[in-house]
C-alpha cells in the first residue's frame, strides 16, 4: 500500500532523527524521506577502515600540536581502535540510520568516550575528511586491481608459451589476412593489460601525492595544525597545496574511471574473440565447463556466459565514468552535495573490474586450444598471398607490380577452386617467368610465419622475446 502523504508535516517528521551533529541552527528535524535521500551510509560504510585511520592520525596531530590534551588524544585513539575491532568482529554491525560513515564513527566514539569524542573534529570538516577517505580507499583498491591484472597477464603469457608454434589465421576487417601464431595473437592482450596496469599505477601515484586533510571546509583552519605530519603518516607524498582544490578535486576518480574503462574495453575485445573462437563457426578454442553455462531449452548448448558478461559489464563501467563527468561538469567551487555521487560510481566500477578480472584469468588458464582447427582455417582464404608477392619482389619485381600479379593469381584460384599451393608450377611460369618451384616452400604456412623476423612480429624468435619481456616484467 503506498504511503499516505495527506496528514502533512507531522507525518513527514514521524521517525525523523533529532540529534544531527549539525542540528544547532535548525528548529525542526529533517523530513524522514529527505533524511533517507540525504544519507550515504549504505554505500560509503565500506570506507570505515580509512575513516578510522584518518581519524587516528588526526587525533595524534591534534595532541602533538597541543590542540587537545594528551589524555584526550589517548582516549580518542583507544576508542577508535575499539570501534575498528568491533566492526571487524561483527560486534558493531554497519547498520545504522547515520547520515554517513563519518557521522556513524564519530557518534559511536562520542557514545563510548563522552566529550573527548566531540573534540576529534577540531580543525577538520567532512569535506576534507571524505576527500581523504576516498583517496586512501582507492589507493588500496588500485593495489588489488593491479595484482589481478598481473595474474591475468601471467595466465596469458603461460598460454602463449604453450602455443608458440600454433599457426592460425590473423585477421583484418574480420577477414583472413596473414598467418600468425596463437601465441602472438594473445600476447597482444598481455601488452594491452600491461599498459592498463601502468596507467592505474600512475594514477595512484598522483592520487597519493595530494593529502587533502587540513583543508577543512574550504578555507583552511585557524589552528596551528601540521598537515605534513598527517600526510606522511597516512602514506601520502605531499599535501594538497590549495585548500579549495583539496575538497573540490575529484580528478583522481575520473582518471581511475577512465583507466578502468580502457581496461574493460581491452577485456571486452578479448571476450569478443573468445566468444567467436568458441563458436562452431570457428572452433579455435573450447572453454572449460566451469566457465560456461547451458540453455534452459536447448540441451546441446555450451554458452560462453562469463566472456559475454565481461563484454556486457564494459558498458556499465563506461556509464560510471560518464555519470561522474556529468555530475561534476557544472559544479561551482568548492564542495557541493552533488559530489556524494562520486562514490557509487567509483565503487561500482571497482567492484565490476575486480569481478571481471577475477573470473578472466582462470578462464584463460583452463581454456583448451584446438590447433588443428586453427591450422585448417589458415589453409583457406589465401592468407599467404602477401608472401607470394614478397617472393617476386625478392626476385627483382617492384612491389606494386607483384601485388597486381598475385591478385590475378588469386582470382584464377577462385575461378578454378584452387589455393596458391595447388596451382601447378607450369601455370605459375606461364603467368611470369620469375616463378620457380621454390615458391611452394616460400608460401607454406610454416615458412610464412618463420620468415617474420622483424622485432614484434609473429616469428618464433620474436614471440619468444615477447614472452621473455613479459616474464621479466611480471617478476
How would you name each of these model-derived features?
Residues 14-210, 215-216, 220, 225-229, ...:
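A helix-coil-helix interface module used to build multimeric assemblies
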Residues 14, 18-54, 115-116, 298-475:
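Glycine-rich cofactor/substrate-binding loops
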Residues 67-68, 92, 283, 398, ...:
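Conserved hydrophobic residue
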Residues 58, 79, 83-86, 108, ...:
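Generic, well-ordered alpha-helical scaffold segments in large soluble proteins
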Residues 5-17:
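Short, Lys/Arg-enriched N-terminal segments with co-localized hydrophobic residues
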Amino acid at each position: 500500500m503506498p504511503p499516505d502523504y495527506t496528514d502533512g508535516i507531522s507525518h513527514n517528521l514521524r521517525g525523523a532523527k533529532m540529534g544531527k551533529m549539525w542540528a544547532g541552527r535548525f528548529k525542526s528535524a529533517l523530513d524522514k524521506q529527505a533524511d533517507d535521500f540525504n544519507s550515504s551510509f549504505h554505500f560509503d560504510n565500506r570506507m570505515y577502515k580509512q575513516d578510522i585511520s584518518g581519524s587516528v592520525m588526526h587525533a595524534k596531530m591534534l595532541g602533538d600540536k597541543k590542540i587537545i590534551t594528551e589524555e584526550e588524544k589517548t582516549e580518542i585513539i583507544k576508542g577508535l581502535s575499539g570501534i575498528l575491532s568491533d566492526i571487524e568482529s561483527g560486534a558493531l554491525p554497519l547498520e545504522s540510520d547515520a547520515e554517513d560513515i563519518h557521522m556513524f564513527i564519530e557518534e559511536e566514539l562520542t557514545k563510548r568516550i563522552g566529550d573527548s569524542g566531540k573534540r576529534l573534529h577540531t580543525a577538520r570538516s567532512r569535506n576534507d575528511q571524505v576527500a581523504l577517505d576516498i583517496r586512501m580507499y582507492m589507493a588500496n583498491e588500485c593495489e588489488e586491481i593491479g595484482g589481478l591484472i598481473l595474474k591475468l597477464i601471467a595466465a596469458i603469457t603461460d598460454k602463449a608459451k604453450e602455443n608458440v608454434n600454433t599457426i592460425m589465421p590473423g585477421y583484418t576487417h574480420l577477414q583472413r589476412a596473414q598467418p600468425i601464431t596463437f601465441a602472438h595473437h594473445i600476447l597482444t592482450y598481455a601488452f594491452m593489460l600491461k599498459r592498463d596496469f601502468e596507467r592505474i599505477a600512475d594514477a595512484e601515484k598522483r592520487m597519493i601525492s595530494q593529502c587533502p586533510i587540513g583543508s577543512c571546509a574550504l578555507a583552511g583552519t585557524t589552528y596551528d595544525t601540521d598537515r605534513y605530519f598527517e600526510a606522511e603518516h597516512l602514506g601520502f607524498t605531499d599535501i594538497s597545496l590549495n585548500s579549495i582544490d583539496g575538497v573540490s578535486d575529484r580528478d583522481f576518480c575520473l582518471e581511475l574511471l577512465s583507466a578502468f574503462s580502457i581496461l574493460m574495453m581491452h577485456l571486452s575485445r578479448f571476450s569478443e574473440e573468445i566468444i567467436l573462437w568458441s563458436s562452431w563457426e570457428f572452433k579455435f578454442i573450447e572453454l572449460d565447463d566451469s566457465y560456461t553455462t547451458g540453455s534452459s531449452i536447448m540441451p546441446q548448448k555450451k554458452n560462453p556466459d562469463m566472456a559475454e558478461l565481461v563484454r556486457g559489464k564494459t558498458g556499465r563501467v563506461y556509464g560510471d565514468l560518464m555519470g561522474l563527468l556529468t555530475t561534476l561538469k557544472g559544479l561551482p567551487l568548492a564542495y557541493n552535495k552533488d559530489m556524494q555521487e562520486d562514490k557509487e560510481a567509483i565503487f561500482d566500477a571497482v567492484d565490476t573490474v575486480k569481478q571481471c578480472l577475477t573470473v578472466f584469468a582462470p578462464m584463460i588458464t583452463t581454456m583448451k586450444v584446438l590447433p588443428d582447427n586453427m591450422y585448417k582455417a589458415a589453409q583457406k582464404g589465401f592468407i599467404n598471398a602477401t608472401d607470394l608477392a614478397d617472393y617476386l619482389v625478392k626476385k627483382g619485381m617492384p612491389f606494386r607490380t607483384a601485388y597486381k600479379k598475385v591478385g590475378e593469381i588469386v582470382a584464377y584460384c577462385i575461378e578454378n577452386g584452387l589455393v596458391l599451393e595447388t596451382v601447378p608450377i607450369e601455370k605459375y611460369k606461364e603467368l611470369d617467368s620469375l616463378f620457380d618451384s621454390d615458391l611452394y616452400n616460400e608460401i607454406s604456412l610454416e615458412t610464412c610465419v618463420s620468415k617474420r623476423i622483424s622485432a614484434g612480429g609473429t616469428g618464433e624468435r620474436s614471440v619468444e622475446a615477447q614472452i621473455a619481456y613479459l616474464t621479466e616484467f611480471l617478476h
